[in-house]
């Protein structure tokens, strides 16, 4: 929002340097991005009155005699198509500085002396977007009613003597998107009540309210007011209004459109003016668009309307995209005589989505989406009507149509003096706080410690006690808050047992060569429950940034897969990533957080070189990494079991659930081909992951691995070759071997797996190496032989395995 310092002075008695004021406003919470002085760097630019204008034969040039307030007129050669005798124009004299620090000198053009330059607005620093269309390709001509004299500087007449404060407004401070709102804000800072005058409107035309049948859905437009102004004369706006518009970054159009923009800047209430001929059938309807309806907007852009767009129609066809922009078919034109003014409150969410959907964000839509002051609907309508009567010779017809007129009660927030002082660390009295609230335009009730504060409707951002704390703090002055040491209970320092365990796990994983990734906690609803054995109700965000960040994650693998995609798209194929973080669910109607650890592997364990071939990462490599982690934190191998699982997003035959003492703590496996195929960057890659619930296993952690003395007695090894049915797993076999191997069974290792044409159909060959050890005495062959016989017999009976 570009705020004119001179316009602010209509509301407040300001004598402070504009740049100092900008600094003061910034310190209270509304950032002033810049303070610009349009006349800065310009000199010797004056009003000139063209006395004579002759065409120079054979050229597009004109030789002009111009009165610039000196004893004699000066001669200037000008090539603008709209230069003519009798006009008041902008003249840069000899030695003048114009935009771009360009210096103007006397010279000759086509051999004819020229003692200066007749300027267009762009040449003295105006942006193209604010220059009126009629002057875009020529010089600027002062309106006939402009109070200017030859020889006086142009800066005041054009509003260039002003200072423009650029309010960098956050979405919660929509109240400052108007001059009145800015005046309330600045007034609170300088402790002065702004002079905001009521509108007194006289109706001098016949009643018109029976001319139009208006149908409005209150959900789409809770307030919808109309007035009719007859016999308007379309023309140029007075110069005072034009300069206020272009200093706010808005191009003057004509006296009707300019009034609607001016009132929007003044009150924050977007307005629209229709040519009354648009509604010749006497109908106006506010509704949702129908499928395949189209509308050509005022910017000549044709849009295909969405069924969620709010539109205004003439009873049949659309004439405006509500809250965004009017239609070309209802535009006020040069021959317009009767105008219908609209002042309304539209559903802000719908307006925002329409503006975004059609890539057409406007000054009006930005105000509706942030929230307008419902109390200004009537004032804005009457102000626009008053200005059209004064500046366009219009007749204000009696009556207004209030198709919808919902009311919004001011919010009331309760707090206490002691609470505000406690949060701010101040010792302000009740009287001091009441004074601050009065400066802000809030009313206060209550007694003693209690504060009952009524918030005006222009302030949408105040709803809870913490908001009142902020208001008191910023108006009192953050610079005035005393610096104090925080009061904390004494502790012995150090990490808690859980923090220590979590850090230890992270250190171990990093020691395995993995790099830490940090991903978003927010994801899409679909991704939130992927890679999860038993998805729980998700935690949804009420006001998401977009649909892909609307849900709190239930797993960490999703974020690692996104990180892998990002890296692989940039030719980084060898990946070993991990993330330790929280996941969320809404089970049993409570919001729950769990600490998880996840890892992702892709590529090779070692790159190929002259010493060895490369080896691709597979399930067993990742399982080995996880086994080493469990051992390092004191979880025994025999307590861990891997069971085949079907999990969404995971490979159906290369995925296992991880169980510790029969309790599920996570999963391990390969991403499903369906997942990697959908992402171009991941296509063709084999990606392995695991994820474990750290909260579940933290109670199982010990201080670390315990060292054992080397055995004093020799071990005995025996090989065991088995013909195994395909549906029997290694885990089942090892469990039976451990069950029957006796107390001296020390270790089991798989040494070979084979499945081929030489093996019986439906079977596979697995060979094991079993190690037996008596740590207190020499182990005999007889003891080992007995154990082997028992193992073989049990495998044959329980799992239908043949010993080869």
Swiss-Prot record:
Cofactor binding: number and manner: Binds 2 magnesium ions per tetramer.
Keyword Protein biosynthesis in annotation: yes
Cellular component terms (Gene Ontology): phenylalanine-tRNA ligase complex
One GO MF term: catalytic activity, acting on a protein
Keyword Nucleotide-binding: yes
Residues annotated as domain FDX-ACB: 711-804
Family annotation (InterPro entries): aa-tRNA-synth_II/BPL/LPL, B3/B4_tRNA-bd, DNA-bd_dom_put_sf, Fdx_antiC-bd, Fdx_antiC-bd_sf, NA-bd_OB-fold, Phe-tRNA-ligase_IIc_bsu, Phe-tRNA-ligase_IIc_bsu_bact
Organism: Lactobacillus johnsonii (strain CNCM I-12250 / La1 / NCC 533)
HAMAP family, sorted: Phe_tRNA_synth_beta1
UniProt signal peptide: none
NCBIfam families listed in its UniProt record: pheT_bact, YtpR
Cofactor(s) annotated in UniProt: Mg(2+)
Sorted UniProt keywords: Aminoacyl-tRNA synthetase, ATP-binding, Cytoplasm, Ligase, Magnesium, Metal-binding, Nucleotide-binding, Protein biosynthesis, RNA-binding, tRNA-binding
One Gene Ontology term from the biological process aspect of the record: phenylalanyl-tRNA aminoacylation
Family membership noted in the UniProt record: Belongs to the phenylalanyl-tRNA synthetase beta subunit family. Type 1 subfamily.
Residues the entry annotates as binding Mg(2+): 461, 467, 470-471
Compartments where found: Cytoplasm
Protein name (database record): Phenylalanine--tRNA ligase beta subunit
Record domain B5: where: 408-483
Any Pfam family the entry gives: B3_4
EC number: 6.1.1.20
Assembly description: Tetramer of two alpha and two beta subunits.
Gene3D superfamilies, per database record: 3.30.56.10, Bira Bifunctional Protein, Domain 2, Ferrodoxin-fold anticodon-binding domain, Nucleic acid-binding proteins, Phenylalanyl-trna Synthetase, Chain B, domain 3
Catalytic activity as recorded in UniProt: tRNA(Phe) + L-phenylalanine + ATP = L-phenylalanyl-tRNA(Phe) + AMP + diphosphate + H(+)
Residue stretches making up the tRNA-binding domain: 39-155
